[in-house]
Amino acid sequence: MINNFIIISEARSGTTSLTGSINSGLRTPENRFWSNGIESQPVLGEPFTLLFKRIDDPDPSVARNRPLYNYVHGENGFFTRLPERTKKFVEPKRSPKFKIEDRHDTPQYVFDDVIDLSYTENNGIKEIVRGESYCEKLLSATSRCDYRYIHLRRHNHLAMAISFWMSKQHNVWNFPANWPQNKKFRQNIINKFKDFDLEPLDITELERHVARLDKRKEIFEDIKNENWITIEFKDLYSSGHELSYNTYLKIVDFINLDIHSETFNKCQGSHTWVDMFFGNGKRVTQNCVYDKIPNLKEILSHFDYTKEQLSERI
């Protein structure tokens, strides 16, 4: 039986690919869609920010392309099954631009109610570190349940900050896995990414971002126990397949998940499965991308970095 789990990390540390690999594996033709036609979410991605989001777009294609949003806010969705106290708090604050990290007044019961419902409906949750107060409330809620924690850790903070602010411009946060049936969709996203003309990155914003990452790098170290596993970015996203594969096995063994079954790996085989989600083809910020940053030289000089250091997978 799979242990319920939390995937948690700073943004740009690989949480989306890890979540995607588990979601895709756990979905089957029998459980892919709920009775209301909404796609199931074995791993619920960033529920607290999503809870407060509002997307008011009349184009039906927009709704169809947002399965996670539909899971939460669609007809008979996750939001409708939350206790009234949380719905009453959340509904007036929903907005396209809501950021939960800016709302320190979010009460503990919102975190508790979301976790209680998700624990019964989802195998896991993916969350992003959003500050000390946010993490305290999240962990206070999850500690009441039998979760295992997968902490993805990345040390190249400048690379993370640059990747984040580039993605804010072109809005490509992750390449889809290299499924044969996904080829056209995947290529469209890659082309959008390749053809985008980046504007200069704000060095002051990068400074603030790196400072936040530096400050929070030890945020979980004092509370880790046997229910935590720390996964280094350089191992899961290694340039060598064997290290990536063995690291992925370490994760799935920790949560009692069998990736060798054809039901999970969709007859691709476990090695191919890992390559599809963590191979070089999944990297958004590859070395050549840095050359597209108009003020790259100024950034490197300001942070006393070399391009080789920026490209290190650590």
Predicted regions and their residues:
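PAPS-dependent sulfotransferase catalytic core
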Residues: M1-V110, N174-L198, D202, W273, ...
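Short, high-confidence coil segments that cap the C-terminus of an alpha-helix
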Residues: I2, Y119-N122, Y147
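Acidic-histidine catalytic/liganding microenvironments
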Residues: G25-L26, N225, I293
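Exposed alpha-helical structural elements
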Residues: P67, T106-D113, K137, M160, ...
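Glycine-rich phosphate-binding loop used to anchor ATP phosphates in small-molecule kinases
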Residues: D105, Y109-K137
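PAPS-dependent sulfotransferase catalytic domain
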Residues: G124-I259
